[in-house]
């Protein structure tokens, strides 16, 4: 192909007229002689480069006005175009003048002679400083947004209307095991197990056809799939947006694995507490029954024996039968007493498994069970726990049973109170003990009630059985501690108990 021949048009005044017009728009013009490297530029070009009108134009002067980091790049571009042809389009920053740091864009084309030899590089200078500032602001904003995405604990994934991943946050990388570069461009169904993986494209297609809004903005629990093939429960919320007339969907994903493990642990803990509570209640009731019934049963047996002696001299032909019946009745009365004692002994045989436990951990776990719904009841919870009085020697389940009982009693006592505050503290006590205090702002109780609070079957509640506090005190005393209660001067009640302090070793 023959080289393009471009020559300067004849000077009929129209070229100068055009030059003046574009100069009026802040566009500088310039012309570089590729043989002599002589440079000619307009007044606007001088202004853009920060060069005075009295300074002679030169190629070296032009290069000296560029930032050092840009100078070599611009010079290489000019050399490349002059030798190989093509277009010239570079941006650079002005240095060493009042315009220092200002961005200029240079665009030019080659002018060839009739033989096709490049003679001149002629073009324009454009002020693009404002454009660069906008670009910089956009980059800063993008960096800022990416930094935010890096710190968001929940995974964020953006897909287009065809299910193709467009954005994959750092949290998503950690959660699913795919890097951002690997995930972008793939179908989002790689993050799903079957059958959702095969069906997801049809889900999107149906939504785009029907615009059914039930999937947008509503969180739900689904199953996710990691790169290694393992699955996990996750909470998914989806939002929709439009960009360029095309729909995009943003998914916010939270891993529920730890949450479900915690829930399972709480359910297990609750089951343990329920089991121990039932055994404790049985033991307390068996002890009370043994104490209350043994005397009348013994009296029945004695009366039976006395009645038999009265019949000893009787001539009634049925006397032997009556004596036999009285003997059997006396035996059954004694047997009933033995059954109650055996039941009490059986329940009481459960040995405590005392270990070194963290009191703060016991209180936290017991609070998750005993204080469920407290916030909904507008109860202020304040745990003021001393780390220096944290380790105790205790049976975890039994002490949590005591705490749960106290917490639930406190919530019930504050149900009708205007001010609802529950405070739990722990402090070192004498004789290597640690004292735990549970204080509420409920209805409290009269001083004459206090001596009976811990008696079996005594209750101040309409529906109470009266065994909870009795069991709690028995547990604490079995640990070598003691338990007592006081009325608060400002209303409410405070329960205290002590436990043996433990050593880390």
Swiss-Prot record:
Tell me the Gene Ontology biological-process terms attached to this UniProt entry.
Answer: nitrogen fixation; phosphorelay signal transduction system; regulation of DNA-templated transcription
All copies of domain PAS, residue ranges: 14-85, 141-208
**Phosphohistidine modifications at:** 291
Notes on how activity is controlled: The heme moiety regulates the kinase activity.
Query: From the UniProt record, which GO molecular function terms apply?
Result: ATP binding; histidine phosphotransfer kinase activity; metal ion binding; phosphorelay sensor kinase activity
Looking at the UniProt record for this protein, which Gene Ontology cellular component terms does it annotate, in alphabetical order?
Answer: plasma membrane
Q: How is the cofactor bound?
A: Binds 1 heme group per subunit.
Sorted keywords for this record are: ATP-binding, Heme, Iron, Kinase, Metal-binding, Nitrogen fixation, Nucleotide-binding, Phosphoprotein, Repeat, Transferase, Two-component regulatory system
The PAC domain extends over 88-140, 209-268
Q: Which cofactor does it need?
A: heme
Reactions performed catalytically = ATP + protein L-histidine = ADP + protein N-phospho-L-histidine
What residue stretch is flagged as signal peptide? none
Q: Which residues form the Histidine kinase domain?
A: 288-503
Q: Does the keyword Protease apply?
A: no
**Stored Pfam families:** HATPase_c (PF02518), HisKA (PF00512), PAS (PF00989)
Q: Which SMART domains match?
A: HATPase_c (SM00387), HisKA (SM00388), PAC (SM00086), PAS (SM00091)
Residues annotated to bind heme? 200
In short, the EC number is 2.7.13.3
Enzyme type, top EC level: transferase
Q: What does this protein do?
A: Putative oxygen sensor; modulates the activity of FixJ, a transcriptional activator of nitrogen fixation fixK gene. FixL probably acts as a kinase that phosphorylates FixJ.
Q: Which NCBIfam families match?
A: sens_FixL_Rhizob, sensory_box
- The name of this protein is Sensor protein FixL
Organism this protein belongs to:
Bradyrhizobium diazoefficiens (strain JCM 10833 / BCRC 13528 / IAM 13628 / NBRC 14792 / USDA 110)
């Amino acid at each position: 192909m023959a080289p393009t021949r471009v020559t300067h048009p004849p000077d009929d005044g129209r070229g100068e007229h055009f030059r003046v017009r574009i100069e009026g728009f802040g566009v500088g013009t310039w012309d570089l002689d590729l043989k002599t490297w002589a440079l000619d530029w307009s007044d606007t070009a001088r202004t853009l480069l920060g060069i005075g009108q009295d300074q002679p134009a030169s190629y070296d002067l032009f290069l000296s006005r560029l930032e050092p980091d840009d100078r070599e790049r611009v010079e290489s571009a000019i050399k490349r175009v002059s030798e190989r042809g093509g277009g010239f389009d570079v941006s650079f920053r002005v240095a060493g003048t009042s315009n220092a740091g200002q961005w200029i864009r240079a665009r030019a084309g080659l002018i060839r002679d009739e033989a096709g030899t490049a003679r001149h590089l002629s073009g324009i200078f454009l002020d693009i400083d404002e454009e660069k500032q906008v670009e910089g602001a956009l980059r800063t904003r993008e960096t800022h947004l990416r930094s935010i995405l890096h710190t968001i604990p929940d995974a964020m994934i953006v897909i287009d209307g065809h299910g193709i991943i467009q954005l994959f946050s750092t949290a998503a990388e950690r959660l699913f095991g795919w890097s951002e570069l690997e995930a972008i461009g793939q179908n989002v169904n790689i993050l799903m197990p079957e059958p959702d993986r095969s069906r997801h494209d049809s889900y999107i297609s149906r939504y785009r056809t029907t615009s059914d809004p039930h999937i947008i903005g509503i969180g739900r629990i689904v199953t996710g799939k990691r790169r290694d093939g393992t699955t996990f429960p996750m909470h998914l919320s989806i939002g929709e947006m439009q960009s360029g007339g095309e729909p995009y969907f943003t998914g916010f994903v939270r891993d529920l694995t730890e949450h479900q493990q915690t829930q399972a642990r709480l359910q297990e803990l609750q089951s343990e507490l329920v089991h121990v509570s039932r055994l404790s209640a049985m033991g307390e009731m068996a002890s009370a029954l043994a104490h209350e019934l043994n005397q009348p049963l013994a009296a029945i047996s004695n009366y039976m024996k006395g009645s038999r002696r009265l019949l000893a001299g009787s001539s009634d032909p049925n006397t032997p039968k009556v004596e036999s019946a009285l003997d059997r009745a006396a035996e059954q009365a004694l047997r009933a007493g033995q059954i109650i004692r055996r039941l009490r002994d059986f329940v009481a045989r459960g040995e405590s498994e005392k270990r070194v436990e963290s009191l703060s951990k016991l209180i936290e776990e017991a609070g998750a069970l005993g204080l469920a719904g407290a916030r909904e009841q507008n109860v202020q919870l304040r745990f003021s726990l001393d780390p220096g009085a944290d380790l105790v020697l205790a049976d975890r389940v039994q002490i949590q049973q005591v705490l749960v009982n106290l917490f639930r009693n406190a919530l019930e006592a504050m149900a009708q109170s205007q001010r609802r505050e529950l405070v739990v503290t722990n402090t070192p006590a004498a004789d290597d003990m640690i004292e735990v205090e549970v204080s509420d702002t409920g209805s409290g109780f009269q001083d004459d009630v206090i001596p009976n609070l811990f008696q079996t079957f005594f209750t101040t509640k309409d529906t109470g059985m009266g065994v909870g506090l009795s069991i709690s005190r028995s547990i604490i005393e079995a640990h070598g501690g003691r338990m007592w209660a006081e009325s608060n001067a400002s209303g409410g009640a405070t329960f205290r108990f002590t436990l043996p302090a433990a050593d880390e070793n």
